[in-house]
Amino acid sequence: TNSVIRKNGDAVLGKGQALEAKKLVPGLEHQLGEYLRRYGNRAFYMGVHRVGDRLTSLVTFPTKHHYRDNSDLDLIMRSAVQLKEIAAKFQLSKIYLPPVGCGLGKLDYEKQVRLVLNQVLDDDRFVVVLGYKGL
């Protein structure tokens, strides 16, 4: 995700994983827009939602400051720390994430992102799903 809020208060979830999440969770852009306005660009626990036949906890994971930017490794590090805190607080036993910051974020997973994530997401609760093509 990114920190951009539209004039109507909704977060911009226009492409990539953010758009996929928006399609699955009605009202996500409004809820996230409110959180961004109040607390800034950080990871947020967005509650439990039905995805297909499963109940799934949704956590945002900012990789960009603005949707036009490339992803930022320092922000990914900060988001990973926040994700780990959220996982502990809400007792999330398994967290699946795409190779964050890659694709539209223009980072290379093996050369850049993996090193950052491995510093923080250092136990088997966290699983990066490579080859992920969307929800």
What is each of the regions a protein language model found here?
Residues T1-L135:
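Macrodomain-like recognition of ADP-ribose-binding/processing modules
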